[in-house]
From Swiss-Prot:
SUPFAM superfamilies: p53-like transcription factors (SSF49417), SH2 domain (SSF55550), STAT (SSF47655), Transcription factor STAT-4 N-domain (SSF48092). Upon activation, forms a homodimer or a heterodimer with a related family member. Binds NR3C1. Interacts with NCOA1. Interacts with SOCS7. Interacts (via SH2 domain) with INSR. Interacts with CPEB3; this inhibits STAT5B-mediated transcriptional activation. Keywords: Activator, Cytoplasm, DNA-binding, Nucleus, Phosphoprotein, SH2 domain, Transcription, Transcription regulation. It comes from Mus musculus (Mouse). It holds the Pfam family STAT_bind. Changing residue 327 to M: In strain: NOD; reduces DNA-binding affinity. In the virgin, found in most tissues. Particularly abundant in muscle tissue of virgin and lactating females, and of males. Belongs to the transcription factor STAT family. InterPro entries: p53-like_TF_DNA-bd_sf (IPR008967), SH2 (IPR000980), SH2_dom_sf (IPR036860), STAT (IPR001217), STAT5_CCD (IPR046994), STAT5a/5b_DBD (IPR035858), STAT5b_SH2 (IPR035886), STAT_linker (IPR048988). One of its GO terms (biological process) is taurine metabolic process. Residues 589-686 form the SH2 domain. This is Signal transducer and activator of transcription 5B. It is found in: Cytoplasm; Nucleus. The modification Phosphotyrosine is found at residues 90, 682, 699.
Length: 786
């Protein structure tokens, strides 16, 4: 069902929220009459931070205007005449509004569509059995909204009380002036004759006594009104503090935690729009109460009456200033975090946002935000309010940006699009700590003027910790530092303290989250996979996951100490698995065609009762990012065979599916699925040509084909009897595939258009030297390409 049809079925508060999304910036009539066209456009494909995408945004604006004009032209009849005029007016209005800033139109429509989807989803979840979590969230949000309504009513009540106090005081002042006038009349009685003076004096005395009695009584009433008003403001501020604590210390902190976990591959942190609407309501109510308190102070100064009110007002004024200060400083947040693995001399982006910028008119005097990089120790000093001015750990280019107010979405934000870390200054490292364990942070600071320079706040916010690298080879270990920090950081920590040890189930959760995100798969790590990983990490043979639940994993075990008998850490091995899956094997993993997390003995145990030609794919234990084929073929020499592991470089030359298609004696994918049924859709389709076919230039085309020497004769012997070795790839694919002898190499080291990297080149040289000089391990059957 189209989103707009569902949106029209919203009711109550959800319907009001949906209607509030529209206005002069984007009329709801445009959404209604162009609903199908709007929902069919790829609004999310445009990168709002990339100026080069401006062309796409302009095309969308032009398309929208054309569709509106077309819709207007098709209107007929009396009612159609009015609609024709209205739609034509909207076309002109939108063209005029967004002609110079088409990106704002994209931002506006994305904002609208996102919130419509959210409202529809919340409405649907609320009516489904699976919506218990959504129900709990809705209940919490309902409670917050009810508290806002209570605060609104209380604030309206204190406004009425303040007006009553003001009117009472104004009348009191008038009567007080009358009392002064009577006193002046007493002074003039001496000019009258005795009889008239006596008569006049008696009348004035009676009037004066009556008026003074009234003034004394009214002064007490005024004082009582003032005390009652101050007490009501105290109660309002208590409720405001409670509401602000829920929003800032609960909801906003949860959003930041989701943002942190999203850095590990968790679900997106979600929109800030609901949080911003709450913060704006807080700002509005706080500011109204602050203005009321200041007016009450002015009334007290205008007519001083001895009593406790002055002290009470001074207290509530200080309290509300603290509240608004906390609101402004806490709602200056990083909407889009900088990359947590930050390479020097590389462009990066970030976005900061003030959630109360529109309501407090901060945008009337657009503030400038500055970004600097500081060390972990400098971040600690900053939070202790120690003087760290101009104490930075590096130089960032393009690090200043003016905050912009986006009328369509009501957001005040600064988009740093072209920052680059020019240099970094490292601190002395502790013990075995490497450069990829050193944490920095990007500090964003600014100065906000609130209420027409009435209040000025210095605001600062820190990014999630970043690890600075100077070469791509450091990325693996830097990612481990970031993963550990994001997963196990505790709320309110001292920067950037993390536990040195965590329970194995906690690490399992983090690894699974990262794995699914990196491989971009819903097929995560199974219980059996986690048992295999635990065996690898702890060097224990138990097959029960429960046996590992109480065991702890230290950071050193994770990515500082090598695994027993290996020259790599647990994380380096796991990251290699993710890398090869992500780059070359993702569809096969999603199909369940890769068993992966089994060792050699487990593979043999699984294959022992299977027919010859059954094979499985498992991750190599000796080669980072390697995957090997284990298969069963009972011969005089052996029963189980293991092919030398393939790596990313191998799959860059020839895909896994094509390699498996070459090996005709591999028949069944474990447990019993025919190989071609699983892999044929991934074979490279090549037109069948005679073996002697020549290219236009007269050259004979070479072939690249996977060959295992021990099985080469059997797999190519077409005249032999029908054995398992005679199995060939699917008949729809030509078995004799032709390839260029030198296929494009994705390795940046060999890219003639790229930068020459000596270290990467030496890595390749060392690898080739190692392969040439390494004695053949009897556990592997070498593979070749012919």
């Amino acid at each position: 069902m189209a989103m707009w049809i569902q949106a029209q079925q919203l009711q109550g508060d959800a319907l009001h929220q949906m209607q509030a999304l529209y206005g002069q910036h984007f009329p709801i009539e445009v959404r209604h009459y162009l609903s199908q066209w709007i929902e069919s456009q790829a609004w999310d494909s445009i990168d709002l931070d990339n100026p080069q995408e401006n062309i796409k945004a302009t095309q969308l604006l032009e398309g929208l205007v054309q569709e509106l004009q077309k819709k207007a032209e098709h209107q007929v009849g009396e009612d159609g005449f009015l609609l024709k005029i209205k739609l034509g007016h909207y076309a002109t209005q939108l063209q005029s509004t967004y002609d110079r800033c088409p990106m704002e139109l994209v931002r506006c429509i994305r904002h609208i569509l996102y919130n419509e989807q959210r409202l529809v989803r919340e409405a649907n979840n609320g009516s489904s059995p699976a919506g218990s979590l959504a129900d709990a969230m809705s209940q919490k949000h309902l409670q917050i909204n009810q508290t806002f309504e209570e605060l609104r009513l209380i604030t309206q009540d204190t406004e009425n009380e303040l007006k009553k106090l003001q009117q009472t005081q104004e009348y009191f002042i008038i009567q007080y002036q009358e009392s002064l006038r009577i006193q002046a009349q007493f002074a003039q009685l001496g000019q009258l004759n005795p009889q008239e003076r006596m008569s006049r004096e008696t009348a004035l005395q009676q009037k004066q006594v009556s008026l003074e009695t009234w003034l004394q009584r009214e002064a007490q009433t005024l004082q009582q009104y003032r005390v009652e008003l101050a007490e009501k403001h105290q109660k309002t501020l208590q409720l405001l503090r409670k509401q602000q604590t829920i929003i800032l210390d609960d909801e906003l902190i949860q959003w930041k935690r989701r943002q942190q976990l999203a850095g590990n591959g968790g679900p997106p942190e979600g929109s800030l729009d609901v949080l911003q609407s709450w913060c704006e309501k807080l700002a509005e109510i706080i500011w109204q109460n602050r203005q009321q308190i200041r007016r009450a102070e002015h009334l007290c100064q205008q007519l001083p009456i001895p009593g406790p009110v002055e002290e009470m007002l001074a207290e509530v004024n200080a309290t509300i200033t603290d509240i608004i200060s906390a609101l402004v400083t806490s709602t200056f947040i990083i909407e889009k975090q900088p990359p947590q693995v930050l390479k020097t001399q590389t462009k990066f982006a970030a976005t900061v946002r003030l959630l109360v910028g529109g309501k407090l008119n901060v945008h009337m005097n657009p503030p400038q935000v500055k970004a600097t990089i500081i060390s972990e120790q400098q971040a600690k000093s900053l939070l202790k309010n120690e003087n760290t001015r101009n104490d930075y750990s590096g130089e960032i280019l393009n690090n200043c940006c003016v905050m912009e107010y986006h009328q369509a979405t009501g957001t005040l934000s600064a988009h740093f699009r072209n920052m680059s870390l020019k240099r970094i200054k490292r601190s002395d490292r502790r013990g075995a700590e490497s450069v990829t364990e050193e944490k920095f942070t990007i500090l964003f600071d600014s100065q906000f003027s609130v209420g027409g320079n009435e209040l000025v706040f210095q605001v600062k916010t820190l990014s999630l910790p970043v690890v600075v690298i100077v070469h791509g080879s450091q990325d693996n270990n830097a990612t481990a530092t970031v993963l550990w920090d994001n997963a196990f950081a505790e709320p309110g920590r001292v920067p950037f303290a993390v536990p040195d040890k965590v329970l194995w189930p906690q690490l399992c959760e983090a690894l699974n989250m990262k794995f699914k995100a990196e491989v971009q798969s819903n097929r995560g790590l199974t219980k059996e996979n986690l048992v295999f990983l635990a065996q690898k990490l702890f060097n224990i043979s138990s097959n029960h996951l429960e046996d590992y639940n109480s065991m702890s994993v230290s950071w050193s075990q994770f990515n500082r100490e090598n695994l027993p008998g290996r020259n790599y850490t647990f994380w380096q091995w796991f990251d290699g698995v993710m890398e090869v899956l992500k780059k070359h094997l993702k569809p096969h993993w999603n199909d369940g065609a890769i068993l992966g997390f089994v060792n050699k003995q487990q593979a043999h145990d699984l294959l022992i009762n299977k027919p010859d030609g059954t094979f499985l794919l498992r991750f190599s234990d000796s080669e980072i990012g390697g995957i090997t084929i284990a298969w069963k073929f009972d011969s005089q020499e052996r029963m189980f065979w293991n092919l030398m592991p393939f790596t990313t470089r191998d799959f860059s030359i020839r895909s896994l599916a094509d390699r498996l298609g070459d090996l005709n004696y591999l028949i069944y994918v474990f447990p019993d699925r025919p190989k071609d049924e699983v892999y044929s859709k991934y074979y490279t389709p090549v037109p069948c040509e005679p073996a002697t076919a020549k290219a236009a230039d007269g050259y004979v085309k070479p072939q690249i084909k996977q060959v295992v020497p021990e099985f080469a004769n059997a797999s190519t012997d077409a005249g032999s009897g029908a054995t398992y070795m005679d199995q060939a790839p699917s008949p729809v694919v030509c078995p004799q595939a032709h390839y260029n002898m030198y296929p494009p190499n994705p390795d940046s080291v060999l890219d003639t258009d790229g930068d020459f990297d000596l270290e990467d080149t030496m890595d390749v040289a060392r690898r080739v030297e190692e392969l040439l000089g390494r004695p053949m391990d009897s556990q592997w059957i070498p593979h070749a390409q012919s």
